[in-house]
Amino acid sequence: MISDLDQFCAQYGCTPSLRIEAPGRVNLIGEHIDYLGGCVMPIAIEPKITLLVAPESNGGKIELWSAEQEDTKYKISPKDFTPKTIPEEHWLNYAIGVMGAYAEQGVMTPGCRVGIFSTLPAGAGLSSSAALETAFALLIEELSGQSCSILERALRCQRDEHEWVGVPCGIMDQLSVGAGLKNHALLIDCQEQSIKPVRLPKGLNLVVADSGVKHALADGEYRERRQACEAALEILHENSWRNISLESVLKNQDVLGDRLFKRARHAVTEMQRVNEFSDALINNQIPKMAQLMQDSHNSLRDDFEVSCPELDVLVDAGFAFGVEKGHAGSRMTGAGFGGSTIHLVHESIASSFIEHLRSRYQKAFGRELNCFITQASDGARLQPLNTLKPAL
């Protein structure tokens, strides 16, 4: 297999001087509540997006090339930093959006040549978009000499999603990609914008299963869920979901109506589940963790209505394996409408667990399941400039 470094050299005829890596993420629990000011528990994972960069004084032009689109190279300049330059859902929008977000703060992207490489499947709910945004943010900061905090970087990348891509996302993905810590989950308070690392129990592996259903968050369903929660909050006469109890939601069921009631019930119960899951994780209470993950998935399926048959089959298969055999929890991860499931399993049974998932998935849908084992990873990072050498 040709290395990414050799591919870059063949494409551009020069050697890069900078390598940037940004991981994907899974979320253990706390779905669709980051944009409601709740707490979430994501993990940065090993699959990642890599940028190789060669600074150039080519009139300020920025050349972008993705290894997944070998025949296409893009040349852009600061005047191109306007929302929706090209069709929605194109990866270039994320890159241009980050450059635009920094330009709004007076930080311009110097001319450079960029090669983009990925081991993250796009549309699998693993935050490939946030990884790409964060990688480009680090690129801009390194080349411009103007760095910022992990939080400010995440906020600029979030602005990219809102204004350039059209997805009203919360802050979880960008923060988890930027602040990931090896062997730890991150307890992120999205209202206070604070991060507390929580060490994962030794001996647990993360199994990620791609449902094969690609999700597209800019198509309106994600926005509808957020708008429904905002409407429910207004009906409940509160300014924060942190102030609302399940009792209050139940009391106002008739006023909310069926759809808003279900959205509100998910919001308040998911916030409570995150608090309980954090305590269970710290105290290594595996059965409690598994139950909370199952309750979370059921709520996303029934109340928030963002699951799909493929996700449900994978989660059910996980719990059918049995906690007594080393299974510690399963749920959909990410915004839903397809994407992936996350499974916590003991490292000694990870391989047999994957075969179990593949068998159940094949039987249900007649196609092969793509899944992999991963670990909690460090967040986005730069590689020292003098360590990059092409193969001889």
Question: Where is each model-derived feature located?
Answer:
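C-terminal nucleotide
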Residues: 1-25, 50, 54-88, 187-329, ...
